[in-house]
Amino acid sequence: QTWNTVAKECTSTYGPEDVAYVEVSPPQESIQGTQWWTSYQPVSYKLDSKLGTEAEFKNMIKQCNAVGVDIIADVVLNQTTGADVADGKQTGVAGTEYNGSTGDYPGFATEQYPEGITASDFHSCSKNISNYANQQEVQECRLSSMWDFDSESEKVQDIQSDYLAALWNAGVRGFRMDAVKHIHTDSMKAIKENLLLISRP
């Protein structure tokens, strides 16, 4: 799957078959690799991924919309990278540098937060989740060794709501929230409220 092939499918199949929505894979930059799960380890919220460039992503949305198909994007807000890429400085699929050992992800930088994401922007729990009956552990410890965003942080909420707004402004009309049970409910409410404020015309 690439954004170009999805665009072609919209034109040749989904539109003519009156499909209303198509869900696509996470569109943000991720770690390198061809395996499906690499898309769920973001290193920035740039819309350049192994599926195509930002321009190709936006063109796909335009082509699908033209035949009556709206796009739902899979969104990864719970975590960044895991132990499989925790070996010093590396680069994502779009060339963004990050350090999975120290928790430094400058690619998440915004105008408000030019330093990007650092280790202090993650929950302090560094162990993997093992007890799914413990809500705090489920929502603050690591899923499969991946760094767990401190979603209660205003900084993290701002960066993530900006990302969702960028998707909305690109034409995405729905979100499938990956691993949302691992994020505090109040945090998701705050991110949604921020999104509503900044995505209004």
Language-model segments: residues:
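Substrate-binding/active-site clefts of carbohydrate-active enzymes
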Residues: 1-11, 16-170, 186, 190-201
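Short catalytic-loop micro-motif centered on adjacent basic/acidic residues
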Residues: 174-180
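Active-site environment of divalent metal-dependent phosphoester hydrolases
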Residues: 183
